[in-house]
Amino acid sequence: MEMAFSANDRVALGKSGLKVTRVSFGTAGLGNMPETFGFAVSDKEAEETLAAVFASPINCLDTSRNYGMGEAERRIGRAIRANGGLPKDFVLATKLDRDFQTNKFDASRARRSLEESLETLGIDHIPLLHFHDPEYASSLDDVTCKGGALDELFKMKSEGLCQAVGLGAGRTDIMMDLIKEYPFDVVLTHNRYTIVNRHAGPLIDACAARGIAVFNAAPYASGVLAQGSATYKRYVYQEATDEVLAPVRAVEAVCAKHGVPTGAVALQFSMRNKNLASTICGVTKPEFVKQTIEWASYPIPDAVWNELASVAFSTDDPEATRTYVLG
C-alpha cells in the first residue's frame, strides 16, 4: 500500500516566500450560487464553515470577487473579523476580476478590483493575488498591452499589495501563451485535471518546466466525485446525462469494489502529481472541512490505482459546452 498523504504538509510557491498546505480550501460555493452548484449556502453555514477552516491545519483559502458577486469575500471578511484576524502564516488568495457589467478589464479595473477586495475582506494586502479569467475580458488587448491589466498586476506586487501573483483561468490555450510572457509565481487551473479528465496536463508540465507553482482546483469535477453520481447528477457546473456521467460511474465502481471513498481517490489522484503544489477543494459545511482532511490521508491500496489506470479518461476541455452564469 502506498504511503498516505498529509493534507497539512507544506510546499513552497516558487520563490515567493509563501508556503501552502498540500490541500487548500475553495470558497466558490460560499458565494451562494445555486444556479452554478445546485444548492444554496446560508450565512450561518458559511460562518461555521469558515470558522472550521481557520481552526484546521490547512493554511490556504482561495476566493474571488466573482463568487456570488462579492458574497464570498463579504462572508470571509466577517469571518476574519470574528477570528481576530487571519491565523498565523495563513495564505489568503483572491483574484482580480473584470467589470461584471461591461467585461472591461484594463489597468484601472484591475486596480479597482483589488481595492474592492481589500475593503471587503478588511485587510490592507493579500498574500496571493491571481489574475482571473482573461478569456472573458471584452478585449484581451486591454489585458496584455503595455500598461494593461497584467502590467498593473505586477505593479501592485512591486508596491507590496500582494506577495505572490498568479493566473487563474479556464482556457488552457490562453494560459499557455501568458505564462511564456509574464513571470507568474502561480497558476490555478480548475476542473481540467481530475481522475476523469486530463485536459490541463500539458499546462501543468509547462508550468513545472518554468518553476511556476500550480494549484489544481475542483478535483471532484465540481462535486460529483465527492457526492456521488446517484444523487448529484451534475458535471462541471451543469446537469449531466448518463453518458456524461459514465466515466465517473466507472471510477465509482472500482472504488466500491475495493471499499474506498471515491472522494478520497479523486483528491489523492491530484495529490499524487508532483507538479501540483496544492489541490483546492470547495467546502460549504464544517463537516466537509473535516472530511477533506481525512480523505487526503485515507489509505488507498495499490490495487485501486492499478485498476483505475485502465479506466478511460478525457483530454477534451470539460467546460467547452458550458453555459456560463455570472457570479
Q: Language-model segments: which ranges?
A:
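Active-site groove signature of glycoside hydrolases
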Residues: 118-139
